[in-house]
Amino acid sequence: MRDLHTAGRAAIATALAAACLPVAPASADVFDGRIAFSSFRVDPPAGMQRSGDIFSMSPDGSRLRRLTTNPENDRQADWSPGGTAIAYSIRKPDSPINFEAARMTAAGTGHRRLTTTADPQSSSQPSWFPNSRGLLLRRSGPGLASSIWQMGTAGQNPELRYQPPNPVLYPSFSPDMKKIVFTGVVSPEGDTDRAIFTVDADGGGLTTVFDVSGAYDSAPVWSPDGRHIAFESNANVDDRNPEGELEIWTMESDGSDVRQLTRNALHDEGPSWSPDRGRKIVYTSGPDDLNGDINVMTATGRHLRVLQPHEGRDESPDWQAIPAPKTARRCGGVSSQDIRDVRARGIGMICLRARSLARRWAKAGRPDEIRGFAVRTKDLGGTTRVVMTRRSILGARQLVAFLDESG
């Protein structure tokens, strides 16, 4: 999901070159971190417009944290690739519809507006470059007029990236940064017909990857490996959605192998993949635009579960990717100690021993060293990444890595 003249050309060329730098492979190991989302559960003060704030929670819906606390409308959170920061949209003061792009840390500190867009224009729906060196965003004007822009992570060097033939929403780079996916409004008048497009990073090769006439095909998001796209649509394909409700779908990145994952009388929208191999999809589901909960299911549409059920509306979930050391074994968790996703590597480092070390570390008060293992920790907004290492007698490095949810 979403000014140019001669003096700025050097900066523009530099930014474009940075956008094409190689990125880490999508298969790099990551943990599934926290889920950030917008929520309208907090009532605005008397006389203020109804607005939302950004929260985060653990993948099971526990350990809820409120990350923004202001009377303006904070929406469309997007985690940085390293899981340390969140870009989001913040409504301009005294405006019901116009937004600016902003960012904050994973813990909800260091709030900073990145754009200052002259009225009646708006800058919204920021999404990180996969190499963390910039942000795409939607720049819009009166009505539906809009285009794809890019800027640095501090808001520097804003520039037009791509001007599509139709109004645009929810732009984002593929993991290898070779393509941009986005929603295009294709209805002759108003916003009643949307389609999903991809375009090459250089602005060529515009391709329609999903378009059902008269349907609302929107909110595309890349899978971690870039092979698939999840999206929302109210299309009635093969009479599988006769009521025309918004449902969650997936497809190959070229538009083939289209699959409808949800099928119910609710509005299912705004999907996001779990970072660790894209095995799950999180999304919003509710009876109408004023009510909705964050749900999670497998990437095949099974084992659906509601996270944080409550009255009101939660929307636009995005799943934090926490970098993880490469390991040979995935060992589960230690639920009694708030430890999950234990991973092990090294000679003699079997899962039983890895979980035992994690348990002992937690019971010992989470020290910097335990049983000869050096311990490094990093807090990422309430979830702590823990890495334990030491050299064995054979010189090979033994390693235990996991997430600690006790914070």
Label for each model-derived stretch:
Residues 2-28:
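Secretory targeting and sorting signals
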Residues 23-33, 377-382:
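Short, surface-exposed loop and linker segments with low hydrophobicity and enrichment for Pro/Ser/Thr
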Residues 92, 139, 285, 333-338, ...:
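Short acidic, glycine-rich loop/turn motifs
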Residues 267-286, 348-371:
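Short, positively charged, low-complexity/disordered linker segments
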Residues 325-360:
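Extracytoplasmic/periplasm-facing segments of secreted or lipoprotein envelope proteins
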Residues 345, 353-407:
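Extracytosolic low-complexity repeat regions of secreted or lipid-anchored proteins
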